[in-house]
Amino acid sequence: MRYLLYFFLILGIHNAQVTGLNGWDLFIDPGHSQDENMGINGYSEAKEVLQVGLELMDILYSQSDIDTVYISRTNDNQSVSLYQRTNYANTVGASWFHSIHSDASSNTNTNRTLMLWGQRNNGNPDPPVGGEEMSSFMIDILTQGMRIG
């Protein structure tokens, strides 16, 4: 049932109540902060992904029965290091960590969706188990939703 949440979010179906996420929590990390990763023409990845993260948090609370949504930063004035983000997510014990980035390239023909999950050196999944399975499921939906490819 939790896969339905991503389906509704990516395809933009509004006012649909997604159930089955009760007992779940999510950590949203709008990657970078402040002036990090400034693009050409003054594009700020940090500002753009913050808006996406805040909107995602609003959608999750208003259109699902998810218990808790954590977010690593809530405004452009916060400077949050990678260590602080991961430490916060690990401290609260979130079920899912979702880091949002909008990587860019000077090659306009390059469009990609990147999904990462934890894996130990011996090849076993990094707890909580399920990241690879979720990423395998999500990659096509995210790519289609962002109209990449």
Language model features: what each stretch is:
Residues 18-26, 34, 43, 47-149:
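Active-site-proximal helix/loop segments of hydrolytic enzymes
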Residues 1-4, 68:
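Intrinsically disordered, low-complexity segments enriched in small/polar residues
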Residues 38-40:
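Short, glycine/acidic-enriched capping/hinge loops at junctions between secondary-structure elements
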Residues 3-14:
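Sec-dependent N-terminal signal peptides
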